[in-house]
UniProtKB/Swiss-Prot annotation:
PROSITE patterns: RIBOSOMAL_S21
Source organism phylogeny: Bacteria, Pseudomonadati, Pseudomonadota, Alphaproteobacteria, Rhodobacterales
GO cellular component: ribonucleoprotein complex; ribosome
UniProt record similarity statement: Belongs to the bacterial ribosomal protein bS21 family.
Name this protein carries in UniProt: Small ribosomal subunit protein bS21
Length: 68
């Protein structure tokens, strides 16, 4: 990952780097890999995440249809 520093503005470059890492999911992956996760726990977590995403999508869809 590469970020250019313009006008010696390191703070702005650091913010850009953090934003890129966040978008790529690096922080989330690091957090998940801090400890070993059993395959059964991983499967349960992924299933719960999928359910959460589906509910969120349904909520947004209902809100859009309700607004029309």
């Amino acid at each position: 990952m590469q970020v250019s520093v313009r006008d010696n503005n390191v703070d702005q470059a650091l913010r850009a780097l953090k934003k890129k890492l966040q978008r790529e999911g690096v922080f989330r992956e690091m957090k998940l890999k801090q400890h070993y996760e059993k395959p059964s726990e991983k499967k349960a977590r992924e299933k719960a995440e999928a359910i959460r995403r589906a509910r969120k999508l349904a909520r947004k869809k209902a809100q859009r249809e309700g607004g029309l």
